[in-house]
Amino acid sequence: MIKHRPHGIEHPYAVSPDQRVPVLPLAGEPVLLGVVAPEADRVVCEWGTLELPLSATSAAAADAAALAGGEGHLSEAQAKSLGADGAWSVQTPPLAEPVKYRFHAHRGGAAESTEWFEVSPAVWTADGVGEVRGGGERVRGVEWLVSSQGVHRGRFRLQLQDGDRLVGFGERYDALDQRGRELDAVVFEQYKAQGVHGRTYLPMPFAHVVGADGNGWGFHVRTSRRTWYSSAGNELTVEVALGDEPVVDLAIYEGDPATVLTGFLDEVGRAEELPGWVFRLWASGNEWNTQQLVTARMDTHRDLAIPVGAVVIEAWSDEQGITIWRDAVYAVTEDGSAHRAEDFSYRPDGAWPDPKAMIDELHARGIKVILWQIPLQKTEFSTGQVAADAAAMVRDGHAVLEADGTAYRNRGWWFPQALMPDLSVQRTRDWWTEKRRYLVEHFDVDGFKTDGGEHAWGHDLVYADGRKGDEGNNLYPVHYARAFGDLLRSAGKAPVTFSRAGFTGSQAHGIFWAGDEDSTWQAFRSSVTAGLTAASCGIVYWGWDLAGFSGPVPDAELYLRAAAASAFMPIMQYHSEFNHHQLPLRDRTPWHVAETTGDDRVVPLFRRFATLRESLVPYLTEQAARTIATDRPLMRPLFFDHENDPEIWNHPYQYLLGDELLINPVLEPGATTWTTYLPAGEWIDVWTGDRVPSGLVTRDVPLEVVPVYCRASRWSELQPVFS
């Protein structure tokens, strides 16, 4: 067997061994051609009138190493997905005109050939073959990437001034100000180290230009296709993938940051106000996979007097069908139709002997319940409900399709080869969520952790709403969160979804967290940046796995600094990764961190932060409502209120929590003092009640203190929170 796919597996950042690189070469560029022919002794490319012998290669090992996010169970799968045995490659002469090519694989006296492929050189031209709509005089240097196959991309330049700052582009982990950086906007599951790699689960083709002269503005490329950005000197170059029409639709918003954000959200939608309970502490651990474990963890919260408002149960179904409690007894619905609550019974010796009673008990204690989801359907089971559901998805037209009409199978490393429901249309959204309705209506589940959503790879995938993959893939996580929000609303509940992936339009759909991260100080800093950039784009309800979820248990200092900061973020949650149930445990519960580190300060200080968080819930609820009404972020970068103060850019991790509180997380180990910049105004140190002048102020930061300052005008109302 010999395989060559010009686009490869369409990993956005890596090359697969059967790929053409580049897929769309420029005139005068050579092309690297790859094939996979595991049993071949010799492979030859028929390239026009030339015959090019291929050499055996080591299947993108460098890409696999670069993309593995570090230690963790997903890193192995990630690296493995890019490898292949029997990889061959050859570099062609520079491409000057369209060329047809094919491959011949030889083994002994036998030969096998591929079909013919064609590649055409492309050139950038300033000829008026397309149109940039909108932008006016801000748009310069318009060019189009053209080949004999059509117009593929457009690019243009936006003028910047000295001192202008670029903030936005969705959730970004590497820097608040993206001036001088190169980035793109494509939904991608980067397992850890997102800031190092410059990738994100939640991109948006939108940014603020915070003007050094006070004349700010912003822009939105109205597309769901991939875009690229590069700023050098006083210009921002924007490159846009095109569809059938050579048109770029660009919106420009003039005004201060809040005005710019309002213009953007008026187009794409804004957050829906969620109930106050979402601001309480969330507790989670992937290995809490039985009723006994979940109950025990919540009992310990109670016994140690550590308030908790929600528990996220990830392994309730053990990642098989994600619809039925593990060990439940039931009859398979062979047509893939939804079960009802009365269709199930639960074994006394099973993992979840009485999940309804467990949820009722948690509710009686004031603890909400969130269940994990992923928008994939496993296919490795030949019998049972999972197999019936997979067959129904394909048979009844609910699957995302390949260009040839077959069902798309996940090309990524997590749930490989799984089917993907086509959530672009209401028909499939209803079919997919109806299987979970009994969880909401009978079990009284309060929300869903809508994990994943980054699994669509392929420019030519086919969606039922008429889009192809190049246009529909980035929108997939938006449809996904919407589907579960609609399910919850239909049952009379708030649309509490908890997602990591998203795109333009995600602002209207629930809560987000920063995704997979190690327990390191660098990840802590990256997560703060992620929260601020997401907020700049209209994400209101946002959090992270405090102190990271992956790798060894964090030391006490990192854990407590992260908990202190998280008490002053929109969502406060701890979580731990799957670790094959090995010992020692890697739970991030405060008592386990205390036991692991031997530091007896952890539990009392964490209790202090969680109790303080309870007192902040009314303030956070009030401020979230104000955010939605005014478009001034809840976790607010300082430039929204102090855009004309150049000093704020020297303090990129500081932020306002609502209108009244300024937060400066302690982000380095071993700190005994910490310096905060207080913009113009009158401020109160919330821990001492002392009035503090604006400017640079340094205070002691023992582990129980994160620098927080309140505007003096609201101190009388907020003082009881900190008493």
Curated annotation (Swiss-Prot):
- Keyword Lyase among UniProt keywords: no
List GO terms (cellular component aspect): cytoplasm
Indicate the residues that form the catalytic site. Answer: D451, E454, D516
According to its UniProt record, which reaction does this protein catalyse? Answer: cyclobis-(1->3)-alpha-D-isomaltosyl + 2 H2O = 2 isomaltose
Binding of substrate, residues = H581
Task: Report keywords, A-Z.
Answer: Carbohydrate metabolism, Cytoplasm, Glycosidase, Hydrolase, Polysaccharide degradation
User: For this chain's UniProt record, which GO biological process terms are given?
Assistant: polysaccharide catabolic process
Any one GO molecular-function label of the UniProt entry: carbohydrate binding
Q: Which domain of life is it from?
A: Bacteria
Primary localization class, coarse: cytoplasm
Task: Please describe how the activity of this protein depends on temperature.
Answer: Optimum temperature is under 41 degrees Celsius.
What's the record's pH-dependence note?
A: Optimum pH is 7.9.
Name the Pfam families on file. AIMA-like_N, Gal_mutarotas_2, Glyco_hydro_31_2nd, Glyco_hydro_31_3rd
Q: Which family does it belong to?
A: Belongs to the glycosyl hydrolase 31 family.
Relate the protein's function as given in its record.
Involved in the intracellular degradation of the cyclic tetrasaccharide cyclobis-(1-6)-alpha-nigerosyl (CNN) formed extracellularly from starch. Catalyzes the hydrolysis of the alpha-1,3-glucosidic linkage of cyclobis-(1-6)-alpha-nigerosyl (CNN) to yield isomaltose via a possible linear tetrasaccharide. It has a strong preference for the alpha-(1-3)-isomaltosyl moiety.
Protein name according to UniProt: 1,3-alpha-isomaltosidase
